[in-house]
Regions:
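Residue(s) in the substrate-gating loop at a strand-loop-helix junction
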Residues: 32
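Active-site loop immediately N-terminal to the catalytic Tyr-X3-Lys motif
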Residues: 39-44
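SDR active-site lid
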Residues: 65-160
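Active-site-adjacent segment of SDR/Rossmann-fold oxidoreductases
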Residues: 19, 37, 58-70
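Active-site helix of classical SDR
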Residues: 13, 48
Length: 172
């Protein structure tokens, strides 16, 4: 997961910055609201998105310090209706679900386009994610208790896993 979610962003950012240093423009990395608040069952995913946030924030500071003509934005989507849960390694007793509310992929595409034309430091996609991040910042233990009590159930369908489920590669 780190190879794709973190190192993919690092390598892509480096290539993009080499071009953008000469021509100017916007670097837009896609993170997650889970870079601001962790949820149970998704510890490794949350860690990759925390890493993307830290890298993007540091890169922004470095580019600003060198005077590079590059804006750097971190898009922080909430749960998006993609096949992520169908392909992620599943160690749960049932088929996984994205916790609701789940937003359309077009909302992320629109946010990226918006930030390419109107640079912003960070942009949340999905109001629920922004509310969750704010709650976590101002009421961290209350948010922790809420996540503990709700998120494990919300991420499980209750439907049994098919015997032929094709998960991602996994090694203990």
């Amino acid at each position: 997961l780190f190879d794709t979610n973190y190192w993919g962003v690092v390598h892509g950012s480096r290539v993009a910055c080499a071009h953008l240093r000469q021509h100017g423009g916007a670097l837009i990395n896609v993170g997650s609201v889970l870079s601001d608040v962790a949820i149970p069952i998704q510890g490794t995913y949350c860690a990759t998105k925390h890493a993307v946030k830290g890298y993007t924030d540091a890169l922004r500071l470095e580019l600003e310090a060198e005077g590079a003509p590059i804006s750097v934005t971190l898009i922080k989507p909430s749960a998006i209706d993609t096949p992520y849960v169908q392909h992620a390694k599943n160690l749960l007793p049932s088929e996984p679900l994205n916790p609701s509310p789940v937003y359309a992929p077009d909302t992320v595409a629109e946010a990226i386009l918006h930030c390419a034309e109107n640079p912003e430091r960070d942009l949340y996609v999905g109001g629920a994610g922004m509310m969750l991040a704010e709650a976590s910042h101002h009421l961290p233990r209350v948010t922790d208790k809420l996540m503990e009590s709700m998120m494990i159930k919300q991420q499980q369908s209750g439907e049994p896993k098919p015997a032929n489920r094709q998960d991602s590669l996994y090694a203990p």
